[in-house]
């Protein structure tokens, strides 16, 4: 019998908790948090919605509309965090700087943050923002897992080639501390692999079914 990933049930019951404009508005710093980051229009909201089987994260044709830290509760001790998207040209510079300042404060001070999921559009991977996040994760000893989103936009062969290319680049620059996979929200590609990472970071273990 196939084992059911223990994080699946928690993700399916995810509920919106609150939005925070700055760190002191965040929930109590305890338990387990996994944050989702990505350049604007990298498919972050769609990935979050697919992982939770709900429309929790706001999606929009205008990238960068998520301007706050959005917290979603899985249970009393575990949360997912949707971080602000970055890099959209139409967002005013002062607002970009505001986002950056509070994102850095959150990432640098949050004791309950156990890992960072970084979204990269498979057609445009390793942007300047992505490199900054990689540098921060390694310097902070923060576990990072990359989703190469929108993998359905390429043929399977092209997607695999891009995955191998990015894997090689990351190993050369950042070592083996960062894991990476293909992901597609519309095709539901890569869900089980992503769930396994979440379960590990949130200290949930697969359990054999009762006989």
Swiss-Prot record:
Signal peptide span: none
Annotated GTP binding sites: 38-45, 64-68, 82-85, 149-152, 182-185
Any GO molecular function: GTP binding
EngB-type G domain segment(s): 30-204
Cofactor: Mg(2+)
Source superkingdom: Bacteria
Residues noted as binding Mg(2+) in the record, renumbered to the chain: 45, 66
GO biological process assignments: division septum assembly
A GO CC term assigned to this protein in UniProt: cytosol
Record keyword Membrane present: no
Family: Belongs to the TRAFAC class TrmE-Era-EngA-EngB-Septin-like GTPase superfamily. EngB GTPase family.
Protein name according to UniProt: Probable GTP-binding protein EngB
Name of the encoding gene: engB
